[in-house]
Design a protein with these regions (language model features):
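Beta-strand-turn-beta hairpins that frame and shape the catalytic cleft
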Residues: 1-5, 73-82, 120-125, 146-155
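Helix-adjacent hinge/juxtasegments
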Residues: 53-92
């Protein structure tokens, strides 16, 4: 069985990855990231944790955008997996369904919404949510398991409640050029 950790929207600069994400990444055979690392430092942190396949997102740095494509297709154990950041400009799944069909993939992993979604139909659509900056949901990632051409996908809600992640984000306050502290979330 092949285990794939799917993430998106980590939105970290110089901040450290949450320990729970590090642990899940170390236990996976492959990490896939659907964009919005934000910084090259975050991308490099994931590369140190294991094999990674990734695309860039709309909030990524110019360095990331030069390094990574906007979309890609990978094949794992005869399963075609599409990876893209923005699959739609709305909250419905019409865009992701069309994109999965156009990319001719059995699984589409996408980001941008910061909200976890799994839709099982003729294709598996997965948005892992965000492990650090969720929107109207708990912090999350997704785990894909491929076994003999069968694939299962599940959302993993991370241990800290949403309020804990707001606190975590605020502890990662950034210094602005004028020396004043700038909170990531109010």
């Amino acid at each position: 069985m092949t285990r794939i950790l799917a993430l998106s929207d980590t939105h970290l600069g110089r901040e450290k990855l949450p320990e729970e994400v590090i642990s899940l990444a170390k236990g996976a055979d492959l990490i896939i990231h659907a964009g919005d690392f934000v910084s090259l430092n975050t991308y490099e942190s994931f590369r140190k944790l294991g094999k990674i396949e990734a695309v860039c997102g709309n909030a990524d740095s110019p360095e990331i955008k030069r390094l990574l494509p906007e979309q890609k297709v990978i094949e794992v154990d005869d399963i075609r997996i599409g990876l893209v950041h923005m699959a739609s400009h709305s909250s419905d799944l019409v865009g992701p369904k069309m994109m999965a069909r156009e990319m001719d993939v059995q699984v589409l992993v996408f980001g941008h919404t910061h909200r976890p979604i799994i839709e099982r139909g003729d294709r598996l659509l997965i948005c892992p949510g965000s492990p650090v900056l969720p929107r109207m949901s708990a912090p999350s990632v997704a785990m894909l398991e491929i076994d003999r051409e069968k694939i299962r996908g599940s959302i993993i809600t991370l241990g800290s409640p949403v309020c804990g992640y707001l606190k975590y984000a605020n502890e990662l306050a950034r210094e602005s050029p004028d020396g004043k502290s700038e909170k990531l979330i109010e």
